[in-house]
């Protein structure tokens, strides 16, 4: 009969179990016992005479009977036959017992631990293999007295070993991280703050209310030697300035594409695509007007800004027809009219008055944000450039701060910035000896909290598959799977973000859909179910029969209900977290980790780092920028 396949999945590569040696050992012992019995019986028959040879308290070696038979069988054949008979009886009984053992073993069912699934919780070796814990010390390190290897990278959770000792789980690979954590669950104090208080490279941080700036900017500037930039568009003081139009590669063949992508982001603030006729036509209009503003400002020596573009379209002292005429006759390049600018103006002149008015009003509505004098001032010039995030002499930490009441209206501007960061910093790759060569000075961590609230950023979803090769590591945080997969505000059910995140971690969810997703990620395991059946008369003192059966059944290693009931953090009366809750961590290719949430304020090192006061003024990098003609961004 062909051997059955009891190893499935990854177990197919596991070492095959060695054949049991129980039966051969029992058979050998049975034969040995027979020889020993025959020897002792023969010696007893001759009163343990000295001529029988060496012994210990009248106990002889088992093979002595064979030696004696060679010498004296001819003289005492009957005595030898009686001794042999006794030995054969003992050996026969032993061999019969061995045969029964083999029969019982052959007829006993063997449990298949992998029948319905082989999921299990990770142990320390699994976590070390996944790269979340430092590897154990080698023999050379032990002998030489070298310090044990330390972990580094972003914090993805914590884990308690069998002795109750807490270990931080950190990931330093180029792969991305995706976190599911409901609001007020402790993700900030457990994952974001520890990461920003230890990551020494460049970083882009979306910071709601400015809490992360207050807790981490001081340490990052003073001890991590970062330039810290606070971009808060709606703040009247303390914010760095950044003009998106400064990133356009004006005067190159890429200028039209750059402006087209910028205009698309302006008229599509939610990331739903250009669905209506008015969006498409207003996007085409903005392309022409922005290019016209850029060239006119360049020729006149004044800066081009989005507020100035809005001013062109909404100038109360000038008829809009004069603008269209100016765009068709102005000498943009070497005294010649720019074809993209002239075409956009001609389209508006050829439209019926009602249609052109609707297109114009639609375009102006998308620029209304820049009529706020505070926002207009903060986007009127650039104190830093996008490329400096990874190419400056020092690492750069960019905090994008939005207050809750300004979050919705500032979303289009934040979307423009995130889009530009991805497109500019992942623009080229050099190779040497068939391997990519780093063309950047500093790695970049994109810590995007509540990133689905920015709307669908198609470039972010697409770029996750390749930006790791450019030194960009994304740490994406969302509330639950529904927020991520929402068709209206998220990336839809066919999103590829989860596919491109090597590490996923989760705090206790609030929605059953997220719990079901986490349960599937954890996997299915096989457990043995015991069933006891009794029979007999109800009035009898003893039951007639009791039978026990065992059956392998499947169950999720973590059911959705168990996931929803994972212990969360314990909070005080005012809502402050006092004790950490549980969490789960998933690393592709390894068993799931049932972990413990870290808390930065429980660690004296993190407490000391968070106590470093944040700078009162944002750093400005533009003085050190050397921007050549035509250098800009692909957006």
Swiss-Prot record:
Membrane-side (Cytoplasmic) residue stretches: 1-22, 101-635
GO cellular component terms, semicolon-separated: plasma membrane
Subcellular location(s) of the protein: Cell inner membrane
Membrane-topology descriptor: Multi-pass membrane protein
Key words of the record: Cell inner membrane, Cell membrane, Conjugation, DNA-binding, Membrane, Plasmid, Transmembrane, Transmembrane helix
Stretches of the chain found on the membrane's Periplasmic side: 40-82
Gene3D superfamilies (UniProt xref): P-loop containing nucleotide triphosphate hydrolases (3.40.50.300)
Positions of transmembrane segments: 23-39, 83-100
Primary site of residence: membrane
Presence of the UniProt keyword Signal in the record: no
Effect noted on mutating residue 187 to T: Loss of transfer activity
Any one Gene Ontology molecular-function term assigned to this protein's record: DNA binding
CDD domains in the record: TrwB_TraG_TraD_VirD4
Keyword Disulfide bond: no
Cross-referenced PANTHER family: CONJUGATIVE TRANSFER: DNA TRANSPORT
Function summary: Required for conjugative transfer of plasmid RP4. Binds tightly and specifically to the relaxase TraI. Can also bind to DNA without sequence specificity. May form a pore-like structure that could serve as a channel for DNA transfer.
Assembly: May form multimers of at least 18 subunits.
Similarity comment: Belongs to the VirD4/TraG family.
Protein known as: Conjugal transfer protein TraG
């Amino acid at each position: 009969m062909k051997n059955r396949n009891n190893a499935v999945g990854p177990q197919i590569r596991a070492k095959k179990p060695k054949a049991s040696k129980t039966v051969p050992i029992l058979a050998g012992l049975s034969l040995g016992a027979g020889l020993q019995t025959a020897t002792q019986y023969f010696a007893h028959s001759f009163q343990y005479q000295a001529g029988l040879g060496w012994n210990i308290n009248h106990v002889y070696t088992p093979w002595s009977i064979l030696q004696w038979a060679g010498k004296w069988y001819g003289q005492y054949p009957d005595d030898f036959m009686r001794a042999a008979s006794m030995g054969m009886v003992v050996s026969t009984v032993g061999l019969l017992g061995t045969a029964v053992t083999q029969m019982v073993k052959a007829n006993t069912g063997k449990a298949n631990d992998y029948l319905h699934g082989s999921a299990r919780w990770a142990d320390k070796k699994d976590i070390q293999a996944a790269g979340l814990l430092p590897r154990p010390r080698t023999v050379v390190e032990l002998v030489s007295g070298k310090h044990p290897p330390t972990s580094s990278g972003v914090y993805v959770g914590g884990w308690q070993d069998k002795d109750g000792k807490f270990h931080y789980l950190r990931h330093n690979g180029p792969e991305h991280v995706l976190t599911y954590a409901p609001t007020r669950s402790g993700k900030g104090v457990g994952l974001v703050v520890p990461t920003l208080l230890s990551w020494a490279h460049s970083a882009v941080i979306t910071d709601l209310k400015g809490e992360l700036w207050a807790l981490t900017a001081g340490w990052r500037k003073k001890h991590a030697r970062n330039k810290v930039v606070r971009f808060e568009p709606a703040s009247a003081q303390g914010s760095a300035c950044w003009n998106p139009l400064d990133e356009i590669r004006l005067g190159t063949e890429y200028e039209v594409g750059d402006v087209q992508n910028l205009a698309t982001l302006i008229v599509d603030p939610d990331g739903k695509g250009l669905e209506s006729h008015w969006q498409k036509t207003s996007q085409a209009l903005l392309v022409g007007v922005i290019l016209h503003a850029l060239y006119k400002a360049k020729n006149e020596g004044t800066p081009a800004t989005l507020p100035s573009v809005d001013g062109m379209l909404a100038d109360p002292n000038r008829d809009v027809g004069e603008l269209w005429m100016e765009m068709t006759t102005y000498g943009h390049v070497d005294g010649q009219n720019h074809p993209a600018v002239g075409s956009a103006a001609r389209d508006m002149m050829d439209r019926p008055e009602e249609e052109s008015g609707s297109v114009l009003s639609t375009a102006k509505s998308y620029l209304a944000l820049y009529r706020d004098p505070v926002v207009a001032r903060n986007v009127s010039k650039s104190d830093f450039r996008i490329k400096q995030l990874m190419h400056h002499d020092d690492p750069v930490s960019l905090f994008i701060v939005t207050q809750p009441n300004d979050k919705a209206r500032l979303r289009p501007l934040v979307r423009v910035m995130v889009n530009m960061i991805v497109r500019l910093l992942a623009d080229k790759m050099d190779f040497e000896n068939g391997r990519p060569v780093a063309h950047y000075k500093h790695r970049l961590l994109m810590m995007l909290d509540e990133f689905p609230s920015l709307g669908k950023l198609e470039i972010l979803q697409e770029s996750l598959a390749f930006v790791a090769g450019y030194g960009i590591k994304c740490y994406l945080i969302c509330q639950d799977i529904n927020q991520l997969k929402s068709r209206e505000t998220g990336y839809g059910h066919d999103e590829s973000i989860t596919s491109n995140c090597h590490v996923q971690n989760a705090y206790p969810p609030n929605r059953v859909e997220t719990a079901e997703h986490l349960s599937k990620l954890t996997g299915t395991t096989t457990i043995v179910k015991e069933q006891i059946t009794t029979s007999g008369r109800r009035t009898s003192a003893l039951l007639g029969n009791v039978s026990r059966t065992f059956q392998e059944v499947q169950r999720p290693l973590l059911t959705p209900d168990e996931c929803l009931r994972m212990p969360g953090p314990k909070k005080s009366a005012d809502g402050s977290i006092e004790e950490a809750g549980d969490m789960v961590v998933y690393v592709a290719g390894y068993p799931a980790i049932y972990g413990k949430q870290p808390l930065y304020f429980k660690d004296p090192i993190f407490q000391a780092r968070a106590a470093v006061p944040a700078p009162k003024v944002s750093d400005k990098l533009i003085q050190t920028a050397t921007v050549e003609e035509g250098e800009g961004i692909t957006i």
